[in-house]
């Protein structure tokens, strides 16, 4: 196991991380510490830097300035410990379900792929084609494909956004259950504030490339939908987001 891994999860430390695209500053000297094994949700308005943060952590982009560390090790040096899920499951239609789970692996991987499919409730669909699966089932396959690598860091970029309400709730429960079993660190980007407070230990609001709100979700698990405390935390985040939006409208109106 890599020395940067603690308790099976990857600890993250971002020091003054910035990301610029020409004159557009997306992340602006962002500082962030995430302990190993924590479940963090990231919310904010479109264009605020949420997905850019995930792409930096996934190694898909490099920061303009600053350090991205796993403990004391540059995260880029242990990128094999990181896996990412998107809103689109990105399954190859010409490969079977089990072959999609084992994509890129060598050696004797099929038993591990079957265990990963069993963990997401699809052990009986291993030989089928992706076209035979529902949207929720395809996302379960994508989750199994991430699990087979035993990640220390799981990055989720709106993975449930295209699902119907009931399937979305089932997937939320599944992801939380697997996180509790395996102890990996999770960063979930979502536009759904209720989803953020229902799933995460901690909710971050990114505004103008910085952390505008860092909220601890102090509710024991399993969490009950409709609880007063969940509603209070959701309202706190939404009020902050809306207050910022109102201020921007006033500036445009009177500037």
Swiss-Prot record:
Pfam family membership, one: ABC_tran
EC class: translocase
EC number: 7.6.2.14
UniProtKB keywords: ATP-binding, Cell inner membrane, Cell membrane, Membrane, Nucleotide-binding, Translocase, Transport
InterPro entries, per the entry: AAA+_ATPase, ABC_transporter-like_ATP-bd, ABC_transporter-like_CS, ABC_transporter_ATP-bind, P-loop_NTPase
Record field: catalytic activity: ATP + H2O + aliphatic sulfonate-[sulfonate-binding protein]Side 1 = ADP + phosphate + aliphatic sulfonateSide 2 + [sulfonate-binding protein]Side 1
Localization in the cell: Cell inner membrane
Domain called ABC transporter: residue spans: 12-233
Protein name, UniProt field: Aliphatic sulfonates import ATP-binding protein SsuB
Species this chain originates from: Shigella sonnei (strain Ss046)
